Amino acid sequence: MAPTPDRDGQDKKVCLGVVTGAHGVRGLVRVKPYTEMPEGVAAYGPVETKDGATSFAISLKGMAKDLVICKLEGVDDRDVAAALRGTELYVPRERLPRASGDEEGWYYADLIGLRAVGLDGRDYGRIAGVENFGAGDLLEIAPAEGGQTVLMGFTDENVPEVDIAGGRVVIDPPAGTFGDDAEAERGE
């Protein structure tokens, strides 16, 4: 699931997907899901915009390649649907099941804002996002020294530890990932 930076105790929301455009002329929308199963985008009740200003009842109408086709209540024509392009759809975290696969139980959204720390303790920056462009999950890291974010494969080898309670993700980046040779010790 996609990120919602929220480390200050506010009600945490999790982004289930983003509207990519209109589908047809009756107000259906195409949604890129961030859920493990694409149909999960409509499985947790009404969705809302990031700022919480607008809420929609959502229902799944079909699939189109890697997108889901959804009906958002109150969106009844193509122009309104098209205007929603880029709108992220959120639900309150408490509506989601406990995350599995780890004794801590975390979602990708929980990683946003955590420190990215090397095996040697080096501060690489903060996790800015988790992306997937089709070839696997990538951590987007905002470097500690500033500049452009860096994408790194989110694999067991590159990310040996996620420590939510400690506020950090331990990384072992491949050589050259951060534009220097400090990672060359890894032997790559």
From Swiss-Prot:
PANTHER family: RIBOSOME MATURATION FACTOR RIMM
Superkingdom: Bacteria
GO cellular component, one term: cytoplasm
HAMAP family: Ribosome_mat_RimM
Matching InterPro entries: PRC_barrel-like_sf (IPR011033), PRC_RimM (IPR056792), RimM (IPR011961), RimM_N (IPR002676), RimM_N_sf (IPR036976), Transl_B-barrel_sf (IPR009000)
Family: Belongs to the RimM family.
Gene3D superfamilies in the cross-refs: PRC-barrel domain, RimM
Signal peptide extent: none
Keywords: Chaperone, Cytoplasm, Ribosome biogenesis, rRNA processing
Principal localisation: cytoplasm
GO-annotated molecular function: ribosome binding
SUPFAM superfamilies for this protein: PRC-barrel domain, Translation proteins
The protein's name: Ribosome maturation factor RimM
UniProt-annotated location(s): Cytoplasm
PRC barrel domain residues: 103-177
Record text about domains: The PRC barrel domain binds ribosomal protein uS19.
Subunit and interaction comment: Binds ribosomal protein uS19.
Gene Ontology terms: biological process: ribosomal small subunit biogenesis; rRNA processing
A family per Pfam: PRC_RimM
Function: An accessory protein needed during the final step in the assembly of 30S ribosomal subunit, possibly for assembly of the head region. Essential for efficient processing of 16S rRNA. May be needed both before and after RbfA during the maturation of 16S rRNA. It has affinity for free ribosomal 30S subunits but not for 70S ribosomes.
